[in-house]
Amino acid sequence: FPAFNSPDLKSQCFFENAGGSYASKQVIDKLMQFYTHHKVQPYSPFPAAEKAGIAMDKSLELISGMLNVASSTIHFGPSTSQNSYTLAQALRESNPSKRTIIVTNQDHEANTGVWRRLEKSGFVIREWRVNPETGALSTDDLNTLLDDTVNLVAFPHCSNIVAYENPVVEICR
């Protein structure tokens, strides 16, 4: 992380969110390569575009291998906030019998706001509340919120609000 060599950041701890995180040298190098050699529409029939497409395909293969999922299930977008907004807009047209979304109060507005705003489109928003003593989410509490009308449960893997890592596998069962 080259930024931490600068005098303003040297010897500092940085606990910012993903949108404000500093990039590693490897990411900076790849971005520099992209901006200087392949900043074109990928997959077009000329060398720079072909190389851009190959680089995108390689990144999908690497990520799919890390996550142990098919590369066809991975989609890149400009930011988590924009991706969530796009997904929320698509959900607006979803099955009318599945109009309930569960969000937590363990998250911040950037993660729950897109879902909460769907209430204006007729969705029911249920809040899965943390234990006020521990900051943890209880799967027992979640089970009381679940029914056949639930379309989505949105929760953080790690909450930077209460410094808690949620048991994702247990929650998703």
For each predicted feature, which ranges?
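Pyridoxal 5′-phosphate
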Residues: 1-173
